[in-house]
């Protein structure tokens, strides 16, 4: 079951309000959700309210963000977003380091093989 943090549309015709929810990928846009993580009202002066601790929890559990939800979280809970990006960058750096070490070992083996063929 893949999970996404996304916006769920609420409200009336000319006054749309969104809820930030954790939902299964296969559920419809305005359908069933697992947990309410906040809300966003584009028409109000107080635009949004987010539960940053719960968002952080679900992101650590492997939930993915949609583009619009990421923008909203970046504005409303910048600490959560920065920590998420730091973890992603650390993970990428670790993968790059493993690949670099593998390439180095492979080139050394090839050089040794060439050397043994020459001798």
From Swiss-Prot:
Record's GO cellular component terms: cytoplasm; small ribosomal subunit
Presence of keyword Ribonucleoprotein: yes
Q: Does the keyword Ribonucleoprotein apply?
A: yes
Q: Which family does it belong to?
A: Belongs to the bacterial ribosomal protein bS16 family.
Recorded GO terms, molecular function?
A: structural constituent of ribosome
* Name by which UniProt lists this protein: Small ribosomal subunit protein bS16
- Name the Pfam families on file: Ribosomal_S16
What InterPro entries does this protein's entry cite? Ribosomal_bS16, Ribosomal_bS16_dom_sf
Q: Which UniProt keywords apply?
A: Ribonucleoprotein, Ribosomal protein
NCBIfam families tied to this protein: PRK14522.1, S16
Q: Which GO terms describe its biological process?
A: translation
């Amino acid at each position: 079951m893949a999970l996404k943090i996304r916006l769920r549309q609420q409200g009336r015709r000319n006054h749309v309000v969104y809820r930030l929810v954790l939902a299964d990928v296969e559920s419809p846009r305005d359908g069933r959700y697992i947990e309410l993580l906040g809300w966003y009202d584009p028409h109000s002066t107080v635009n949004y309210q987010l539960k940053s601790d719960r968002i952080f929890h679900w992101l650590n559990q492997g939930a993915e963000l949609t583009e619009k939800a990421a923008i909203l979280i970046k504005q409303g809970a910048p600490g959560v977003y920065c920590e998420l990006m730091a973890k992603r960058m650390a993970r990428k750096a670790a993968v790059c380091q493993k690949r670099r070490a593998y390439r180095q070992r492979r080139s050394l083996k090839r050089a040794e093989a060439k050397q043994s063929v020459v001798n």
